[in-house]
Regions:
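Mature-chain termini and adjacent capping regions
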Residues: 1-167
Length: 167
């Protein structure tokens, strides 16, 4: 006989996760067996296997030709049963390139499909890089092809770089 019995009422049981894990990593491979995506989360919680799992502080790295090509982070994410990941709150997408070529994209929510390396949002988006800023509402990204299509209310400001300004 057990020395301790845990008594949980039915209302508490409905709210309690059926799955809880710390420091979780998921690797996604192409049909050819090459690494395409690594998704890491500090914690993973799920109440019902048929529902989305909630990931805390997810960190996604996309790979192309064996090298990191994109980084995506947020405060939380929902790993949906259909294979999409919905990143929520302070979503940041950044290219894994040299600093002078790098840009940062920020949005409050983003849907991401790891196998297709495709992302989209209907929310406001801000893209910044040295000397420039672009604001829009909604976008679609094909991360394999490295293309971005902004949907509406697009405005951009770009400051030309002049090497003589550094004197």
């Amino acid at each position: 006989q057990p020395s301790k019995v845990l008594v949980v009422d039915t209302e508490t049981a409905k709210e309690s996760p059926t799955l809880f894990a710390r420091s979780v990593t998921r690797q996604v491979f192409t049909d050819e067996g090459e690494l395409s995506t690594i998704i890491h989360a500090k914690e993973l919680l799920q109440r019902d296997p048929s529902e989305a799992a909630k990931a805390l502080t997810p960190d996604i790295t996309l790979y192309r030709d064996g090298k990191a090509s994109w980084y995506i982070t947020s405060e939380t994410a929902l790993l949906n049963p259909d294979g999409t990941t919905t990143l929520i709150n302070d979503v940041k997408i950044q290219q894994a390139k040299e600093a002078e070529e790098n840009w940062l994209l920020v949005t409050p929510e983003l849907s991401f499909h790891a196998e297709r390396q495709y992302a989209y949002t209907e929310h406001p988006v801000t893209m910044t890089r040295i000397g420039g800023r672009l604001d829009a509402v909604g976008m679609e990204m094909d991360l394999k092809k490295e293309t971005v299509e902004f949907k509406a209310n697009v405005s951009a400001v770009y400051q030309m770089y002049n090497p003589q300004d550094q004197d």
